């Protein structure tokens, strides 16, 4: 306690005493007291702002007891507590007494959706991360945890996030719709008593061992100061101001924005927006492309094929992620005993820049010709170490990685001795393989500098225009007779009435741009090829003539369509409309709509159910948008919105509150007790009766409506499955296209050279699909801007001497990369198409197909090492 108190005093004084204790304590040698502030002048053609965010500090909310009661923590602190490098080494303990909590509560919307704090917006990410923390906490504890999340609305609106919400409920997480108004400590226990009002407006209390406050996102003071220096307009909350049709452009031309500074968002959206901002900047700077590029030079590659293997092993602590559970020094000493290992060391962080220099120095000093790194996942870090190999003059495929974090320390947190022994086995297996590794030479592939964009909606046109403005030829395919897609039916968004003006201008630019060739009434009938060199066969006007288009990349932006419900009298009563149909009717000024007295909206029709288990994402905003427009036309119109959770995330929360102030009535319903709709006769006409339960009143309500609007989701188009087959890209279980990685590659497919954007990826608002369309174009540019690209070296190869030409490999290959040469009667591999999945090697009955980098000999050596034989 004395040490902590002294450290707090020292850090609080704000003046460095130059005691140098921090230098001595820092194992990474990252602190240099001699460094001085420098002012550097850079000449640039564009600026991208991504200064991030601060988390809300809940200390002013005294009723929650943060910093008053030790067992009240923020969600960020709770997540840190779960970390292997956190204060309790990944063990879930209470701060007050270091005992495991049995009952944990999360309080949502702390610092969000609160006008009294000047933070009326929704922070968008808190609901999902609270569920994530609750799920992980259950995984961290060997006993049954009681977990409760107190919420206003569960806003898991991201792609597949609602399924995660359902997974949380299935795991036993309790969700209570309530407003917590006070947290008190129970005398002598450290426990916390939550006082709250549930949705029936009745006060209740519950006792918990630990409380996590789900704090919101806010702009940092430094970001606000930066914006003022740059002359950038901010919104009323201090975030960067943008508009729906240019979501990555600031108020100052040439300066772009991405990430949470533009508005609260999660990692996938942030990465998408970052690529979108880069795409906009690239279009602006296209005339100057490559004029300031300095090509990186590598030393000549050493020929080590005739040398005896000399293996160097580098074992990572990864802070406490590995070192907290695995005895890294012991594993290092073990590695030194393995065959052909001539050098081994351990590092605090092997991925750090200084360790890369150490690896290069060790290669030179000890004559290493093979390198093994035992650390985290090769998915994220293998390219870094392979680059270090090249910089040291070695073939990058002479590198091998052992994953002793994901496959060892993380799954054996409570068994350090066994984790250490397993780490030894994993290192032994990696060394056994590394000894047998051979240099590989990737195949250079020439690049066709044109793009094919599938879909003439907003996403497809924005992608096409961005690529065209960067100087690339674009073939834009649209299966209907008009450009515009579903946006042709849209007239306004929250905050803007200019959808049709924007759309008309976009169509005009696309049609007039010399680099874009538009194909209307055109269908794709077949596609083949590989990254840099695709060929797509098209058919126009459903005719018989087939045309071929050669292109280097493909962007799939084929859109989606509005779901047509088979309930609530839709299709049998013309007064029952979808939200999009209602929007069209309002825009046309149809008297039966704009003059009606009672209008009811039902949310989540056809989604968040067994048929479509995802959230429609845009439906709540559509309902609010139409409500505000109708209230503007006829203020005394009675509008009732029956909802499960109002998901007006981000700054759209302002419009939700505006609709409430203007008199729209919101009634929450339970999915187990959905509203009932029927026709009833009243005097000389039939009305639409909507019946449901009001949890606040605690009784049934019945509304006789003139018009009923159903909030329905977007669903994939039928052609999506055909396109997925042609371009060998996956769909998720809902029929939307599936990205390569939700966070690392959110607009890429696993198939190189094919990208996605727009509603084909999943439901989203117009500003989101515009950002994603620019992101897809930006990612495509990484290929189109090169004359050649290198194929992967780890591909299949065929030993023609023992190949029987049976065709088994051809039948199982998911990429069409291997086939039987009918003249030679042996299989041949197209290395540009091969992704190195190894399916053909596993299926080959003669053993003729071998995977470079994963040969049978190498895999057998790993198995033998793992078994100790």
Q: What are the functions of these language-model segments?
A:
Residues 1-869:
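Residues forming the flavin
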